[in-house]
């Protein structure tokens, strides 16, 4: 005979956890809002304002993610209870194992929804930008920065996020000096915000004929794309706008026209660049979006001493502000804030970052 009590206890536990989430995620309000959003999207003139329609579509996906999962959990737990009773009555082991398997699947869905509680920041649901900047160390640091770029692109792909390479500056010999990518998807900023900081690489350098160990640094800075409704006052007189020929990936169009744009905000010293479109006008618009987002993030940091300290540290791409150490010779990657380690270095460099990210979010970093 199979053990019934542990399964009943688990059903009870999952039911209770689902009820807690209903309250925490304000389920009833989300159901109501989903009905409103659906009604708005059904209006024949909704696409007269494309940006508003896109925002509503994005909101609907986020709301459905919560509402549909809660409904699935409610119905699923009821179904499992029915299967369990059927298994007991018929003394049917196959039905019992079916109930156990369904319960495990429901627990995984619930755990994913519970993890969303980590995304409680004001802009966690937003798309975001990731700036990468090579530290001192010449070619070795520039190669490391390109490895980080690949790592984040692979990670985003594994999460189903959309990525755009906004700007990349090639290294002198190999690698890149800097890059900016835009990551779009549900809770993109929430997932990536704890990646801001210095990433340290230790390895035997392929660029050293004596095969000596080298230490290199690269900085990552993650900031959210902000809503157009948020008013950021930018004085055109404070801007220096340069246009130049794009370099790097871009096919036959590269280096033929001055479509790439660089904007310097003189009072703050912030520099943003974009070269991913053939149109100079579109690149300029994208630069202004990035500048607006960075200025907004700077304002938030001024109100928060810890975040301000983090931004101050960013300027020193060296030992003091590291978040993660990648020691390839020892096959060890360690997060210096949470203590999480992974010895499968290639998997991490191929984008397997969830263990590190989840630990830092759970630690409230």
UniProtKB/Swiss-Prot annotation:
The superkingdom of the source organism is: Bacteria
Q: Which GO terms describe its cellular component?
A: cytoplasm
For this UniProt record, give its keywords in alphabetical order, as a comma-separated list. Answer: Cytoplasm, Methylation, Protein biosynthesis
- Report the locations given in the UniProt record: Cytoplasm
Record note on modification: Methylated by PrmC. Methylation increases the termination efficiency of RF2.
Q: Is Cytoplasm a UniProt keyword of this protein?
A: yes
Q: Positions modified as N5-methylglutamine?
A: 252
Which BP terms does GO give this entry? viral translational frameshifting
One Pfam family, short name: PCRF
Q: Which Gene3D superfamilies match?
A: 3.30.160.20, 3.30.70.1660, Release factor
Single annotated GO MF:
translation release factor activity, codon specific
Role played: Peptide chain release factor 2 directs the termination of translation in response to the peptide chain termination codons UGA and UAA.
Q: What else is known?
A: The gene for this protein contains a UGA in-frame termination codon after Leu-25; a naturally occurring frameshift enables complete translation of RF-2. This provides a mechanism for the protein to regulate its own production.
PANTHER family assigned:
CLASS I PEPTIDE CHAIN RELEASE FACTOR, PEPTIDE CHAIN RELEASE FACTOR 2
In the record, the note on similarity to other proteins reads: Belongs to the prokaryotic/mitochondrial release factor family.
What protein does this entry describe? Peptide chain release factor 2
Q: Which organism is it from?
A: Pasteurella multocida (strain Pm70)
């Amino acid at each position: 005979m199979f053990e019934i009590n542990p399964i009943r206890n688990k059903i009870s536990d999952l039911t209770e956890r689902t009820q807690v989430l209903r309250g925490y995620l304000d389920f009833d309000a989300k159901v109501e809002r989903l009905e409103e959003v659906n009604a708005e999207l059904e209006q024949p003139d909704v696409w007269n304002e494309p940006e508003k329609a896109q925002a509503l579509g994005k909101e609907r996906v986020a709301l459905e993610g919560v509402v549909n999962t809660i409904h699935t959990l409610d119905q699923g737990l009821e179904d499992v209870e029915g299967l369990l009773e059927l298994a007991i009555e018929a003394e049917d082991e196959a039905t019992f194992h079916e109930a156990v398997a369904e319960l495990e699947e429901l627990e995984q869905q619930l755990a994913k929804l519970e993890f969303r509680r980590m995304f409680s920041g004001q802009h966690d649901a937003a798309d975001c930008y990731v700036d990468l900047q090579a530290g001192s160390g010449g070619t070795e640091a520039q190669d490391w920065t390109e490895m980080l770029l690949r790592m984040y692109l692979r990670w985003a792909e594994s999460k189903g996020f959309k990525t755009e390479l906004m700007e990349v500056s090639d290294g002198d010999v190999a690698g890149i000096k800097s890059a900016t990518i835009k990551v779009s998807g549900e809770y993109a900023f929430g997932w990536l915000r704890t990646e801001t900081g210095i990433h340290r690489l230790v390895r035997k350098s392929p660029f050293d004929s004596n095969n000596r160990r080298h230490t290199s640094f690269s900085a990552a800075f993650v900031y959210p794309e902000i809503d157009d409704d948020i008013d950021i006052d930018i004085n055109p007189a404070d801007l220096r706008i340069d246009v130049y020929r794009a370099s790097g990936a871009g096919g036959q169009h590269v280096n033929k026209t001055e479509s790439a744009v660089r904007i310097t905000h003189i009072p703050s010293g912030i520099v943003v660049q974009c070269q991913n479109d053939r149109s100079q006008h579109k690149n300029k618009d994208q630069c202004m979006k990035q500048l607006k987002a960075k200025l907004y993030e700077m304002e938030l940091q001024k109100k928060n001493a810890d975040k301000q300290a983090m931004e101050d540290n960013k300027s020193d791409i060296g030992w003091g502000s590291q978040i993660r150490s990648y020691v390839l010779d020892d096959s060890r990657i360690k997060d210096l804030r949470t203590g999480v380690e992974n010895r499968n270095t290639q998997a991490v460099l191929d984008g397997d970052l969830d263990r590190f990210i989840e630990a830092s979010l759970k630690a409230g970093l």
